[in-house]
Each structure stands twice: as structure tokens, then as C-alpha cells.
Amino acid sequence: MPESELKRFYIVREHPVRIISKCKSHSKGTLGSFLIGFCLFYAVVSWVPQILSEFIPATNIDLFATYTDADPAMLSQLPATPLVIILYSVFFSGVFKLSECVYTLTYIRNRQADYRAFTESFSYYLKTLGIYIVQLLLVAFWSMFFIIPGIIVALNFSQAFYILADDPDKSISEVLTESKIMMHGNKMNYVRLLLYYVPYFMIAYIPATLASAAAAKFSLNEPVLLIITLLTDIPIFAARGIMSMGRTVFYELMINKGFADFRYAGQDAFRELETR
């Protein structure tokens, strides 16, 4: 890879604790409004396919049984996933990822939650679909050669939707190539940052775990179980929103080459610890 390309971006060496601390400082007084928007968005995104699957229960197993000669005993061992959830994920995950990036970038840069940011990505639906499908195919292909190559490919493309959010005119190949260049030397640091958010998710999953145990004990009917499941998803969405801020700041560090060069509303929150 040409050295000139590598020099365009910054190797993030800031410790994850430092990044998380600065995110907390930045979000004082506005975290609630940010998480409300984030949770509402992902509530709609996650609940729609779950509700639809109650009315369209056909699964991937039903499809295999109808159109293939696969052994029924073997099919019964496979996990059954409603087709509506599979199709929904393939056709809408890309645009939802871009919506998250636009919303969180807007919040980090302007220090205010702008719910209109969620709708802007739909103008670029076909491009987001193309990026997501290319990512999906490449990760699936490289995962066939053990899991590690697939993880590396996923990390290489992890900044694609942030790049698209900053410049929607870039082509699919330009976005993916730039993401790969940005992540050169940053993959392990990025993974380390994500691992620091594991405790947030462990806490967030407690309500869902308790609800699952209660459902098994009291044999709740399907509608009640669905409502409980939807409600216990909310803490998980909140944890995802908090992690999204850290991921976004990581992207900002790469393009701004460190905290000192942040140039937007709220920049002082990221600089106030620089002298300590």
C-alpha cells in the first residue's frame, strides 16, 4: 500500500478509557436526548420484523423443505429464522447503519441530538444496499477459510458507512477502499475499544435474561412474551447507543489525527483532559 495513502490517516493510540471518558464529558446534559432518539430508532428497526414475523411465520426451514430434497431430520436440527427477518435484514441493514452513523456524527459534531438525521440516509438507499451486500459476501467468503480472515475483512470495512455519511457522492468501491486504508494499523485498537463496552452490554442484557427465565417458568402466551421481549430490548439499544459514540469518536480521531484537531461544537469536551 502506498505510503502516501497511509499518511492520510491517523493511528489511534488513545486508550479506550480515555475515549470513553471524553465521550461522557461531551454528552453531559444531552445524553438523554441522544439515547431517546437512538432507542426509538432501533426500537422501530428491530420491532417491525419481529411483529411482521408473527403474521408471516414462514421460516428458512420451510423454504428448504419446499424447494429442496434435504433430509427433514437434518433440517430439524437447523435454527429456524422467519424469512421476513432475513429479507428485512438484507434489504435494510445498510440504510439503517448509515442512519446510525449520520445521527451519531451529527451529535458528536454539534453536541445536540437531531432526529431528522435518521431520515437523510434513505436518499442513498441503493448505495447503502450495495455496500452492505458487498460486505456481507466478502465476509462470508473469507469466513470459509476459518473465522479470523472473515473478522479481518469485517474490521477493514467497519468505517465504510461513516465515510459515506461524510461524502455520499463516493462510489461503493471508493468507500470500501478508503475504509480498508483507514483501518490499516487500527484494527486491534478498534477491537480493544469495542471490548471495553462489553460490561455495558452485560448489564443491558440482565432484564432480557430475567424475562426469559420468567417466561420459561410461567409459560407466558406469545403476545405477552413478544411485548416483554420488545421492552427488554430497550436497555440493549441504549448500550448500543453509548458504544456508537465511542465508535464515532474513533472514526473522528482517524480523520482529525488526534483530539487536539477536533474543530466543532463540543470540541472542548475532548480537549479538556489533554493537559492532565
Predicted regions mapped to residue ranges:
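Residue-level hotspots within the lipid-embedded alpha helices of multi-pass solute transporters
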Residues: Y10, F38, Y42, I86-G94, ...
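Membrane-interface helix starts
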Residues: K24-C39, L126-G130, H184-R192
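Hydrophobic alpha-helical transmembrane segments
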Residues: F34-I36, L83-L87, L129, V191, ...
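Hydrophobic alpha-helical transmembrane segments of multi-pass membrane transport/permease proteins
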Residues: G32-E54, Y88, F92, L138, ...
